Structure formats: structure tokens, C-alpha cells
Amino acid sequence: MSDNERTIVVRVLKFDPQSAVNKPHFKEYQLKETPSMTLFIALNLIREHQDPDLSFDFVCRAGICGSCAMMVNGRPRLACKTLTSSFENGVITLMPMPSFTLIKDLSVNTGDWFSDMTKRVESWAHSKEEVDITKPEKRVEPDEAQEVFELDRCIECGCCIASCGTKLMRPNFIGAAGMNRAMRFMIDSHDERSDDDFYELVGDDDGVFGCMSLIACHDTCPKELPLQSSIATLRNRMLKVGKSR
């Protein structure tokens, strides 16, 4: 073992809402830090050697699936992309993300929220044209394809929702993920909906007009999506529709 290795302390808020006797409490774990150790690696070592009951989510381990998002020292992050060495004092406090239903410990149900959001903004291409799978796909200009791709990189991790002050106060708020999803289809030429159609979906206080422009979503997005400009553009377009009514 190298003399340069240090011992880190990981504090986890543990709670099983399905238990009649379990109460929320912090539990501390100490472990030796290794080079390039991520929180994901640390949590796996804790579960393997210290606490097999510890619950947290992961799938890809590469910042692609978004499953391992959690509150790290008060900020939503992906465990698989967060190095333990980035915390100088070696003390890391982990909690489940707010605004989502708690499953157990660090595991939350983001799936139901994103499923509901998908239905609310009707996030699929709307077209009056009858589908004909024998036809060549409609040509899309490279600039448009790039703009759509940029907004479509969302991995549904929930970091933007967990960091949103409006979401904490307004449970039905659609959040940055919902507004970004709406904008993604507004700029897609495959979708034939008008701005008026989108206004019916996101043109209220639970939609784009509920945003307080704190931009925590933009600051915490692990994929660095252009949420600030996306939300601003959506708000301007919805404002024009509202004024015309």
C-alpha cells in the first residue's frame, strides 16, 4: 500500500421507506482511496466489504445511462463520473435526489417521473401524414440535425430536476428536462405541431412560465446541455403566443 493513499469518509443517508421501524440516519464508512477512484467504485467497495444492504443504482458506469445520479455534498452528480480525489478533505456526504420517489437509501424512482413528463409534452413527432415505411426518410439539413441532436443528448439522470428550486416548491413543474424535451421537438421539422400546440402543453406556471431562471439546471447538467438558451428560446416563443391570444 502506498504512503500517498489516504482514508476517505463516505457518509450515506440511509432510509428504507418500506420499513415500519427504519428511520432516516447517516452512516459513515471509511475506506482507502485508490488512484482514479470514483464514487461508483467507492460505493461498490462499501457494499461488497462493509454494508451489503446499501442501495444505489447503476448500469453503464460510463456517464451514459444516468442511473447513478445522487446528491454529493449537496449537489446532484453522477457517481460514476465523480472522482473522490476532487474532495480535498476526504469527507463525502451522499443523499438521494429530492423531487423523486425514494426507493431506498440512494435509490430513487426517476423512471415514473420521466415517463409522465414524456406524456405531458407529447414527446414524439406529430405528423398528419400517414406512415409509409417503404418511403425514404425525410431529408434533414445538417444544421437542424445537429441542433436536434444537441438537445436530444439528455440521459434522463434527473440532476436538473433535483437542483431546481421551482420543482421543490411546485410539484407539478415540468422542469428543465421537460422544457428541453419540448424544445427538441419544436425545432424538429418532422414534428408538424405549431407553437400554439406547444403552448397548450407548456405555456403555464407548471411549464415554462414557472421557471424562476435560477439556472441551477444548466450548472449541474452532467452532459452540459445548453439548457439556459433552450429554456430562454422556448419562453420567448411561448410568450409571443400568449400575447397574441
From Swiss-Prot:
Limits of the 2Fe-2S ferredoxin-type domain: 17-98
Molecular function per GO: 2 iron, 2 sulfur cluster binding; 3 iron, 4 sulfur cluster binding; 4 iron, 4 sulfur cluster binding; electron transfer activity; metal ion binding; oxidoreductase activity
Pfam families referenced in this protein's UniProt entry, alphabetically: Fer2_3, Fer4_8
Binding site for [4Fe-4S] cluster: 154, 157, 160, 221
GO biological process: respiratory electron transport chain; tricarboxylic acid cycle
Cofactor note: Binds 1 [2Fe-2S] cluster.
Domain 4Fe-4S ferredoxin-type, chain residue ranges per copy: 145-174
EC number: 1.3.5.1
Binding site residues for [2Fe-2S] cluster: 60, 65, 68, 80
Binding site residues for [3Fe-4S] cluster: 164, 211, 217
Reactions catalysed: a menaquinone + succinate = a menaquinol + fumarate
Keywords linked to the UniProt accession: 2Fe-2S, 3Fe-4S, 4Fe-4S, Electron transport, Iron, Iron-sulfur, Metal-binding, Oxidoreductase, Transport, Tricarboxylic acid cycle
Record CDD domains: fer2 (cd00207)
Signal peptide location: none
Cofactor(s) listed: [2Fe-2S] cluster; [3Fe-4S] cluster; [4Fe-4S] cluster
NCBIfam families per the UniProt record, alphabetical: dhsB, PRK13552.1
Subunit and partners: Part of an enzyme complex containing three subunits: a flavoprotein (frdA), an iron-sulfur protein (frdB), and diheme cytochrome b (frdC).
Family: Belongs to the succinate dehydrogenase/fumarate reductase iron-sulfur protein family.
Name of the protein described by the UniProt record: Fumarate reductase iron-sulfur subunit
